[in-house]
């Protein structure tokens, strides 16, 4: 999946994290999952995305990194991080009385890189900012708006890649987000004891 978002005014790492979580959430929803919660917290423990994939509860960890970063998103899922995810998932299952539900841990890797707006986007943004009649004529001529493209491409059935664009100020840089979804990101037997099923933490 490829997602493009205009850069915001908040600190770069916070903006990148938010964009990464939004892209991950949109990707999972477009894949047919039902999003149950985002940024669920219990003390110092946190779950980025909790979703339902048919009858399975999915705890999705989102890792966002710059394209030229020294650490890949995969490497950020350390054994210590896995242990915290398992503890957080156990607390969520307990608080929602869902101990009997099968669950899994997924990893959504989001890689960001700066990218200038495409010529078509720049012309659309400039026309909108000017508020001219020419912009209205362009809209009426079938030239799709940026958000219209997002809806059609993001949720287009059978599309091998999905793209998401959101416009910002004219000539503003964008972030190109590349999203990779890894189901069953790690083996639960590494962290959990035995139960009625391998994923049950008791």
Swiss-Prot record:
One of its GO terms (molecular function) is nucleic acid binding. InterPro entries: Restrct_endonuc-II-like (IPR011335), tRNA_endonuc-like_dom_sf (IPR011856), UPF0102_YraN-like (IPR003509). Pfam families: UPF0102 (PF02021). Belongs to the UPF0102 family. This is UPF0102 protein Dde_1093.
